């Protein structure tokens, strides 16, 4: 980061929040809520198709929005409470509390996962179960008591879920929850989970993705750029690459998240173990 900003100090002008971000997120939340009475008119099989192709994509994008909000990129770093409360609002259609914080190493598969899911069939099953591993792995790897704000988030979320069930029934809440879970598993937008850190080329531990799905995922594919400049909102990450191409264009990257998932399952040299774990000073290793 220092080397890049020394050569291109204009990148610092990209720091801060995107004033349009909160309106995009608000629109996504409203679309999900407005769709609920229509979803209840669908058969269960058709509802699942719509949840996979539409609702789940929006919910996954909202998860990525919450990650942006965790960086205080909705209202700026000087308004942390506003960011936190807006994160609660963005969370509503997901159905379950999602913090969006980067908890060190809890997204790394455990040794048991690496041993159990190392075959082609095992890796495919691991992708299907990925929502559950992401949800419960932190409770095993680095358990911690919930904070007051996390408890408030839980109460707000459960109240919203109860209102949805009261107004539109169990199919409506199922649409939100199932869509969110499906879009975290074997789904093109979930390819970023694997694409970002799994070592597809020896010696490179992080990878960006420069395909069209960035348009609906707040440019989460610009992963190297985000790691270098977490204070730059997703909408401006392509500008980082444009300003400093020699720092990014020479790195291996992905052009298709679907291909990432296919290669992950079919390539015997790639699996849940194909990640680099760094030691963090001051933390138990």
Predicted regions and their residues:
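Short acidic-hydrophobic sequence patches enriched in Asp/Glu that either
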Residues: 80-85, 99, 182, 236
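Transmembrane alpha-helical segments that form the membrane-embedded catalytic/substrate-channel core
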Residues: 54-66, 127, 131-136, 177-203, ...
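Short, function-defining helix-loop hinge/capping sites that tune catalysis or transport
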Residues: 37, 75-79, 205, 227, ...
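Non-catalytic, topology-defining segments of multipass membrane proteins
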Residues: 1-56, 65, 88, 93-175, ...
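Membrane-cytosol interface motif
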Residues: 204-218
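Aspartate-rich (DDxxD/NDxxD/DxxxD) Mg2+/diphosphate-binding motifs
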Residues: 64, 68-85
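Residue-level signal for cytosolic alpha-helical hairpin/rod architecture
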Residues: 86-87, 222
